Curated annotation (Swiss-Prot):
This is Histone H4-like protein type G. GO terms for cellular component: nucleosome; nucleus. SUPFAM superfamilies: Histone-fold. Gene3D superfamilies: Histone, subunit A. Belongs to the histone H4 family. Keywords: Chromosome, DNA-binding, Nucleosome core, Nucleus. It is found in: Nucleus; Chromosome. Core component of nucleosome. Nucleosomes wrap and compact DNA into chromatin, limiting DNA accessibility to the cellular machineries which require DNA as a template. Histones thereby play a central role in transcription regulation, DNA repair, DNA replication and chromosomal stability. DNA accessibility is regulated via a complex set of post-translational modifications of histones, also called histone code, and nucleosome remodeling. The nucleosome is a histone octamer containing two molecules each of H2A, H2B, H3 and H4 assembled in one H3-H4 heterotetramer and two H2A-H2B heterodimers. The octamer wraps approximately 147 bp of DNA. The keyword DNA-binding applies. It comes from Homo sapiens (Human). GO terms for molecular function: DNA binding; protein heterodimerization activity; structural constituent of chromatin.
Length: 98
C-alpha cells in the first residue's frame, strides 16, 4: 500500500493522452442523412448527390463567420468565454434572428 504525497498523481490527474483523435475532418460529422433531413424539413423532394459536399462547405463557411464575429464580440467585451447571447447578437447582426 503506497501513500501518495501532494506531488503524486491520483485518479483523474493523467498527463497528455498518447492516442488523441485527429480533429482535421470534423465537417464529415455532418452526415448525408443529416443533410437530407434538413432538406426534407425545408421542403426538398429530391437531392442530387453532389449537394452533400457543397452543403458541408457552405455550412463550414457560415460557422466560421459566426464564430469569428462571436469571438470578436467577446474580446471587445473583455470576456474570455463566448456566451450564447454573443452568438444570438451575431445572428441578429447578420439578419438571422433566432
Amino acid at each position: 500500500m503506497s501513500v501518495r504525497g501532494k506531488a503524486g498523481k491520483g485518479l483523474g490527474k493523467g498527463g497528455a493522452k498518447c492516442h488523441r483523435k485527429v480533429l482535421s475532418d470534423n465537417i464529415q460529422g455532418i452526415t448525408k442523412c443529416t443533410i437530407r433531413r434538413l432538406a426534407r424539413h425545408g421542403g426538398v423532394k429530391r437531392i442530387l448527390g453532389l449537394i452533400y459536399e457543397e452543403t458541408r462547405r457552405v455550412f463550414k463557411v457560415f460557422l466560421e463567420n459566426v464564430i469569428w464575429y462571436a469571438v470578436t464580440n467577446t474580446e471587445h467585451a473583455k470576456r474570455k468565454t463566448v456566451t450564447a447571447m454573443a452568438v444570438v447578437y451575431v445572428l441578429k447582426r447578420q439578419g438571422r434572428t433566432l
